[in-house]
């Protein structure tokens, strides 16, 4: 599974290159729709319905033999800086919950973006620690997280502004071919 939360230009270029691959299934999380849910009455009920929609779509990707690529829409919110920071944290926490619910199903995770990756590890997986395995590409680390079933979940921590236009595609190819683990 691949998650792209970063909004920097390089991340968008890398995402677009990845989405050109037919074995990758785009799963777009619309930031405006998420904002409406977090600003409405019945937040928890609507949020759970929204979450279940994404879990179903991601699982359907797996059933089709495709890699789900969960990404936030490339739209900008017109909020003041503190509101924007709080909103993006809520959004990243939501993504972290999705990953947590799928951790035994995904096989590996490529997480693009620092805030997103941090919240997936700390809040979603509640990881007290991970094992650094090394770098998959320059500046891009691979860690493993021990699941309760004694399996290791490889996680690529891919900062938003690091890599080339093809690094996300190249990492995906390496993990799909299982040439590393």
Q: Predicted regions span which residues?
A:
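Active-site catalytic microenvironments in core metabolic enzymes, especially phosphate/sugar-handling
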Residues: 1-181
């Amino acid at each position: 599974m691949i998650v792209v939360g970063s909004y920097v230009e390089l991340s968008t270029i890398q995402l677009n290159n990845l989405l050109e691959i037919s074995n990758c299934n785009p799963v777009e999380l619309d930031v405006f729709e998420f904002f409406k849910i977090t600003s409405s009455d019945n937040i928890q009920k609507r949020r759970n319905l929204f979450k279940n929609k994404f879990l179903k779509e991601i699982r359907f990707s797996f059933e089709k033999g495709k890699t789900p690529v969960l990404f936030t829409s490339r739209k900008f919110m017109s909020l003041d800086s503190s509101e924007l920071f709080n909103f993006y944290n809520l959004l990243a926490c939501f993504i972290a919950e999705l990953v947590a619910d799928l951790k035994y199903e995904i096989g590996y995770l490529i997480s693009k973006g620092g805030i997103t990756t941090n919240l997936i590890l700390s809040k979603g997986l509640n990881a007290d620690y991970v094992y650094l395995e090394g770098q998959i590409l320059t500046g891009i680390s691979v860690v493993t997280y021990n699941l309760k079933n004694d399996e290791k979940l490889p996680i690529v921590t891919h900062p938003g502004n690091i890599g080339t236009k093809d690094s996300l595609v190249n990492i995906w190819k390496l993990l799909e071919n299982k040439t590393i683990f």
